[in-house]
Amino acid sequence: QRQMCIRDSPFFRLRDPAKGKNSVRFTTSTPSFEFEFQDPNADSPTLIFGEMSSTGETIVVYEGDADASTIVDIQFLGPAAGVKLYNTTTQTRINIDTNEIARLLGSTIRAGDRLSISSGVGDKYVRAYRDGKVYNALSALDKDSDWIFLTPGDNLITVRADTGIDNVSAIISFENLYESI
């Protein structure tokens, strides 16, 4: 009598799933600590706790040895248009038609809106979220878009927008996959 083992994926994962799952946050601006302060020298600030700085790209270090699918969550802190996501390492990109998102949501992108894009094998999707409702937003990807995967090693991931880049924050999540023990 023969027994067969059927798996949903041919890849190995770390025994402790928490150690194999990763999330990397990258935002287009990093907010700083703030409070009301009356500066006696208005021309030259005397109390600085932080600076806003552009961080629209990050290097994601992928430690697996097989290409990995990703889930990209894009948070909107306000209006934005023409949002694009690139993996420069693999020369792949996602172009988001924000006019189509506006059509699906009933108005232009605003603070609190979110997109989730999954390149999972057998689980590809684009979802838009507003006010607790979920919308199928696959139609918002243009015909030249690719699904974003990570390759072993360093992956340069960049987020851009035609307008409102300071209102875009992103997190990329992935799981380390291995082809053999």
Question: How should these model regions be labeled?
Answer:
Residues 1-6:
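Short, small-residue-biased leader/transition segments that mark boundaries at the very start
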Residues 26-181:
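Intrinsically disordered, low-complexity segments enriched in serine, threonine, and glycine
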Residues 11-26:
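Charged, alpha-helical interface segments at or near domain boundaries
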Residues 7-9, 155:
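Generic structural signal marking isolated hydrophobic packing positions
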Residues 10-13, 77-79:
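Short acidic/polar capping segments at secondary-structure boundaries
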